[in-house]
């Protein structure tokens, strides 16, 4: 089992790290913090919160490196799980479960991995085990804690968004904006 958890931690952790590095540094084909902030603004997050949120999302995902090494594993898992909650709520939920439709299937799997590794512990091939921290920072209640805090943290982050118009109001607002642009061009 120790080898299985090691493999899971390393693969998922390095993928999370890469995704965070895209946001923080623009590495691996990413766009960096300013473009990520712009994307968050398009998702409805207030302008003054967008850049700090982009940096926090990048740091939380960069925690994948800690997860891969099994160092401060429960804390790293909390950051990773929280980012997945926000990703589902802002981007994927409206598309349904399946990722073929842009849904949250993959995000749910990553969230579950973070919680499961926290509940089961990072395994004997981890820095936490080397330091003797496994029994103090993992277990069922730690997993439950990551589950609850990631959901609560995600809910708090969602409160930083601007109120969203219902879809029909959004369509009407876009139509009015297009009419104004057309009138301006014609004038």
Model-predicted segments: where are they?
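Extended, low-polarity transmembrane helix blocks
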Residues: 1-28, 49-50, 54-55, 73-187
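Cytosolic, membrane-interface loops and tails of multi-pass inner-membrane proteins
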Residues: 30-46
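Alpha-helix boundary/capping detector
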Residues: 33, 46-47, 66-67, 111-112
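Short secondary-structure junction/hinge motifs that connect adjacent elements
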Residues: 35, 54-58
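A general structural signal for well-ordered alpha-helical packing
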Residues: 37, 62-66, 79-82
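Hydrophobic, membrane-inserted alpha-helices
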Residues: 58-68, 91-92
């Amino acid at each position: 089992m120790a080898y299985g958890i090691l493999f899971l931690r390393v693969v998922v952790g390095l993928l999370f790290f890469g995704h965070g590095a895209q946001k923080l540094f623009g590495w691996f084909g990413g766009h960096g913090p300013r473009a990520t902030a712009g994307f968050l603004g398009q998702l409805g997050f207030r302008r003054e919160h967008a850049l700090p949120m982009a940096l926090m999302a990048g740091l939380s995902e960069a925690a994948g490196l800690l997860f891969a090494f099994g160092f401060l594993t429960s804390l790293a898992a909390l950051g990773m799980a929280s980012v997945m909650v926000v990703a589902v709520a802002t981007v994927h939920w409206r598309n349904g479960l399946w990722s073929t439709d842009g849904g949250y299937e993959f995000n749910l799997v990553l969230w579950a991995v973070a919680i499961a590794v926290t509940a089961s512990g990072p395994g004997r091939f981890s820095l936490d085990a080397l330091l003797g921290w496994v029994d103090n920072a993992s277990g069922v209640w730690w997993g439950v804690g990551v589950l609850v805090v990631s959901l609560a943290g995600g809910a708090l982050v969602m409160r930083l968004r601007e109120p969203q118009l219902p879809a029909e109001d959004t369509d009407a607002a876009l139509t009015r904006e297009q009419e104004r642009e057309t009138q301006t061009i014609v004038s």
